[in-house]
Amino acid sequence: MEIKHLLFLVAAACLLPVLSMKRKSAKKLFNKLVTDLPNVQQEIVNIHNTLRRGVVPPASNMLKMSWSEEAAQNAKIFSRYCDMTESNPLERRLPNTFCGENRNMTSYPVSWSSVIGVWYSESKYFRYGLWPSTDDDISTDRYTQIVWATSYLIGCAIAPCRHRGSPRYFYVCHYCHEGNDPETKHEPYKKGVPCEACPNNCEDKLCTNPCIYYDEYTDCSLEVRFLGCNHSTPRMFCKATCLCDTEIK
């Protein structure tokens, strides 16, 4: 047997236990990150609410987020595809609304706080009231989705997968209502004194009175003004405008 061949076999024999230990360690970490665990759900919600109440400038209408099991199930289904391409909006719809989406892929299981921190780090490119850069290398969409005022439900999932032959971990969060409206993306919330828009429904700088409905038309105020909420079109497609008077929408 050639000496090079022998050295290769020795090196491989030494490497196999290391790889086995790494796989076991990764599996152990992954099992602590699955979003079926109530403590993981609460961690994700708490991180988001902490970031939302700390926006600069402060927000007057920022809603407190809660966990949605239905949104989490949609995220779980999509996470199994291990695809960084945005999912079909119909695949992340809830009964009353559509949901936005943030995605991340790693080569090793990392904490949810680390993943959410990656998304939030886009805040360094964001200036309230200014339109986002058109530079393809600069994005603020994941940050603005995190701090979108009217998003009040969140559901997330993580899935192990393989990408080009290597192990990967795919993280997905769905935010409902959906954020990143192209018309208002430069102002994801209303600037002002915390809870100014919800003085009777406030909890630690966050509003607790979401409108559970969603306007599917962008010009619902005009639709309602000219047709009224008794008309079939506004009644079906402008539910937030018609049914929510004091709630945050």
UniProtKB/Swiss-Prot annotation:
Residues annotated as glycosylated: 104, 230
Q: Which domain of life is it from?
A: Eukaryota
Any idea which UniProt keywords this protein has?
Answer: Disulfide bond, Glycoprotein, Signal
Q: Which GO terms describe its cellular component?
A: extracellular space
**Signal peptide from the UniProt entry:** 1-20
- Domain SCP residues, every copy: 45-175
Task: Write down the PANTHER family for this protein, in alphabetical order.
Answer: CYSTEINE-RICH SECRETORY PROTEIN-RELATED
Matching entries from SMART domains are given as: SCP
Q: What is this protein called?
A: Cysteine-rich secretory protein 1
- Biological role: May have a role in sperm-egg fusion and maturation.
Disulfide bond residue pairs: 195-202, 198-207, 211-244, 220-238, 229-242
Q: List, for all copies, the residue spans of the domain called ShKT.
A: 211-244
UniProt family annotation: Belongs to the CRISP family.
Q: Which Gene3D superfamilies match?
A: CAP (3.40.33.10), Crisp domain (1.10.10.740)
Tissue localization of expression: Expressed in all the regions of the epididymis except the caput and is not detected in the testis, prostate, seminal vesicle, and brain.
Biological process GO annotation list?
binding of sperm to zona pellucida; sexual reproduction
